[in-house]
Amino acid sequence: MRIVISGGGTGGHIYPALAFIKEVKRLHPDVEFLYIGTENGLEKKIVERENIPFKAIEISGFKRKLSFDNVKTVMRFLKGVQKSKSYLKEFKPDAVIGTGGYVCGPVVYAASKLKIPTIIHEQNSLPGITNKFLARYVNKVAICFDEAKAHFPSEKVVFTGNPRASEVVSIKEGKSLKEFGLDENKKTVLIFGGSRGAAPINRAVIEMQEGLKAKNYQLLYITGEVHYEKVLNELKEKGLASNMITKPFLHQMPEYLKSIDVIVARAGATTIAEVTALGIPTIFIPSPYVTANHQEINARSLEKHDAAIVLRESELTGDRLLHAIDEIAGNEEKLNQMSRLTKELGVPDAATRLYNVLKEITTT
């Protein structure tokens, strides 16, 4: 079988695609993949690092206000469709999967016009503009949140979950927290604000330093590389808590997750897939800067099952964050209950489910 994958712009669209490729390759080594992205996007560097064949098209997103740039976007889209058709005719895939981001628009649309079976994978509870557009052309729409159903034709929707869940569950031997000087016998809280960090989360962690010092749990705190020096200097002024280790970035984060008891993070789709697959209780601080506030909608879908605590960024303080951490890490019964409820929402076989949908549309 030959499969084309397209998705880009953010890690939330790219990493599920890579997790899917990895799982399918593990189960079926003879399957061939081609990844279509943009030349300047994050996906090019990440995908090529994984030694996956990569082709590029030029595309940009629509402005939400009336703008001459939208005329250019339409022209790029049409050119992107033609370029995609040439790649597809050359590669001759059995199916095409779009995982979101502007780049998959021309690719999946071109595939549908060439009568190639197509799937879009929507990671969020509130779909992006590209997937909404593509829904009318594809064979199936794979979703990760029940809330997304309402935005797509019901006969096309299938719940698969996010393949990133399969990837974290498949890690047998995780990395040890000892390399950071942390005690493996203590409850450990991981705090991070996404790949670049988040200033409001950093501010709250700095504020809670004094209260943190007396706690019997420990923190692994990831500032984001751009914030690291500034945050470290402020922490030193406050007096560093001995039960917190501060790092700018955590490479291969999934390798450490099985050693983590509680997470404080943004509510991106990839993070949610990981914590639910592993059953890690999480305090979500959704980013208010994303389209249609979809991160808060993602987080609330877990909160309503008592599987997460949600703190709005606008209400975030050091005291509130420390209280929320105490509520879970300082209460064994609550931690175990939330872990169980979180895991019940996980889809550890998401990659296999998506592959089964793909097989279904290529054999009918």
Curated annotation (Swiss-Prot):
Q: In which pathway does it act?
A: Cell wall biogenesis; peptidoglycan biosynthesis
The answer to whether UniProt assigns keyword Cell wall biogenesis/degradation to this entry is yes
- Where does this protein hold UDP-N-acetyl-alpha-D-glucosamine? T10, G11, G12, N124, S195, Q295
Record flagged with keyword Translocase: no
Q: What is the lineage of its organism?
A: Bacteria, Bacillati, Bacillota, Bacilli, Bacillales
One GO cellular-component annotation of the UniProt record comes to:
plasma membrane
Record key words, sorted: Cell cycle, Cell division, Cell membrane, Cell shape, Cell wall biogenesis/degradation, Glycosyltransferase, Membrane, Peptidoglycan synthesis, Transferase
Q: What is the protein's name according to its record?
A: UDP-N-acetylglucosamine--N-acetylmuramyl-(pentapeptide) pyrophosphoryl-undecaprenol N-acetylglucosamine transferase
Organism from which the protein derives: Bacillus pumilus (strain SAFR-032)
What are the subcellular locations of this protein?
Cell membrane
What would be one Pfam family of this protein? Glyco_tran_28_C
Reaction it catalyzes: di-trans,octa-cis-undecaprenyl diphospho-N-acetyl-alpha-D-muramoyl-L-alanyl-D-glutamyl-meso-2,6-diaminopimeloyl-D-alanyl-D-alanine + UDP-N-acetyl-alpha-D-glucosamine = di-trans,octa-cis-undecaprenyl diphospho-[N-acetyl-alpha-D-glucosaminyl-(1->4)]-N-acetyl-alpha-D-muramoyl-L-alanyl-D-glutamyl-meso-2,6-diaminopimeloyl-D-alanyl-D-alanine + UDP + H(+)
List the PANTHER family hit by this protein, alphabetically. Answer: GLYCOSYLTRANSFERASE, UDP-N-ACETYLGLUCOSAMINE--N-ACETYLMURAMYL-(PENTAPEPTIDE) PYROPHOSPHORYL-UNDECAPRENOL N-ACETYLGLUCOSAMINE TRANSFERASE 1
Question: What biological function has been recorded for the protein in this entry?
Answer: Cell wall formation. Catalyzes the transfer of a GlcNAc subunit on undecaprenyl-pyrophosphoryl-MurNAc-pentapeptide (lipid intermediate I) to form undecaprenyl-pyrophosphoryl-MurNAc-(pentapeptide)GlcNAc (lipid intermediate II).
Which residue spans adopt a coiled-coil conformation according to this UniProt entry? none
